[in-house]
């Protein structure tokens, strides 16, 4: 069953050039779904279109758009508590003049009624999920953390709301290999144990082949291949997909040589 089903999604710029060319996309419920492709293929545009985050100079059309079996009219009603978004611009999510503890509890209480103590408990739990301790984070300002720490705080701010769907645009790109794998392990655990759904945009094919159940391959604004993980492991693939995987293998070989 699909949680999101969008048909004939097209994105154009002001010159009427199609950047995304009439794609059909389903995000399957309680699975880790992935969208892969080279830089500039349009992966982030698709994520922003699903969330209605596109810049004003781009237009988006589709034949139908359903979320959890219902036609979508105003997606903003789902933000936070039902749909979480992990973007690449994590540094812009927190201001520099308010301590992170206050900002995180405010985010939680914006979406859920509850006491400050309850919010702090949720914040503490989410920080532990991303291998951070509250005592090291809550009384600090964002500029006092490293980029990797701040990204993990940002991921925690999304996870603590326990959304039904998480759309993640390169969620571990700024993390080292150890913390990146820990975050992916956590996201996998959330999907498997808590029934949540993940749509991840990434160029990390190692993560895709290890964690994902359904995969889309995007090239120049078009989906040129799709299928479950067994298709990508065992079936004959599109030449473009073959090149992506071959390049990944070469990178790993160069790294270990």
From Swiss-Prot:
Location of the protein in the cell: Cell membrane
Catalytic reactions of this protein: Ni(2+)(out) + ATP + H2O = Ni(2+)(in) + ADP + phosphate + H(+)
Binding positions for ATP per the UniProt entry: 37-44
GO molecular function: ABC-type nickel transporter activity; ATP binding; ATP hydrolysis activity; transmembrane transporter activity
Stored InterPro entries: AAA+_ATPase, ABC_Ni/Peptide_Import, ABC_transporter-like_ATP-bd, P-loop_NTPase
Statement: the UniProt record of this protein carries the keyword Metal-binding: no
SMART domains in alphabetical order: AAA
BP-aspect Gene Ontology terms: transmembrane transport
Primary location group: membrane
EC number: 7.2.2.11
Keyword set, alphabetical order: ATP-binding, Cell membrane, Ion transport, Membrane, Nickel, Nickel transport, Nucleotide-binding, Translocase, Transport
Gene knockout outcome: Deletion of the nikBCDE operon strongly reduces nickel transport and urease activity. Mutant shows decreased virulence in a mouse model of ascending UTI.
Domain ABC transporter stretches: 4-245
Enzyme class: translocase
Membrane topology: Peripheral membrane protein
Function field: Part of the ABC transporter complex NikABCDE (Opp2) involved in nickel import. Probably responsible for energy coupling to the transport system. Required for full urease activity and plays a significant role in the virulence of S.aureus during urinary tract infection (UTI).
Quaternary structure annotation from Swiss-Prot or TrEMBL: The complex is composed of two ATP-binding proteins (NikD and NikE), two transmembrane proteins (NikB and NikC) and a solute-binding protein (NikA).
Record-given protein name: Nickel import system ATP-binding protein NikD
Gene source species: Staphylococcus aureus (strain NCTC 8325 / PS 47)
């Amino acid at each position: 069953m699909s949680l999101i089903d969008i048909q004939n999604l097209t994105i154009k710029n002001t010159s009427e050039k199609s950047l995304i060319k009439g794609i059909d996309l389903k995000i399957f419920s309680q699975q880790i779904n992935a969208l892969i492709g080279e830089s500039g293929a349009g992966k982030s545009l698709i994520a922003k279109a699903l969330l209605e985050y596109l810049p004003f100079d781009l237009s988006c059309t589709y034949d139908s758009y359903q979320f959890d079996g219902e036609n979508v009219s105003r997606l903003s009603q789902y933000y936070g508590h039902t749909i979480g978004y992990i973007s690449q611009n994590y540094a812009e999510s927190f201001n520099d003049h308010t301590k992170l503890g206050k900002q995180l509890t405010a985010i939680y209480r914006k979406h859920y009624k509850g006491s400050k103590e309850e919010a702090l408990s949720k914040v503490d739990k989410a920080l532990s999920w991303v291998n951070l301790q509250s005592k090291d984070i809550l009384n600090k300002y964002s500029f006092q953390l490293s980029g990797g720490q701040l990204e993990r705080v940002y991921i925690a701010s999304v996870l603590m709301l326990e959304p039904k769907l998480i759309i993640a645009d390169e969620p571990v790109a700024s993390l080292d290999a150890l913390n990146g794998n820990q975050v992916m392990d956590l996201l996998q655990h959330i999907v498997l144990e808590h029934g949540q759904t993940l749509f991840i945009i990434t160029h990390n094919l190692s993560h895709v082949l290890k964690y994902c159940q359904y995969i889309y391959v995007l090239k120049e604004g078009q989906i040129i291949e799709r299928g479950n993980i067994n298709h990508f492991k065992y079936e004959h693939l599109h030449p473009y997909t073959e090149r992506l995987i071959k390049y990944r293998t070469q990178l790993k070989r160069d790294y270990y040589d």
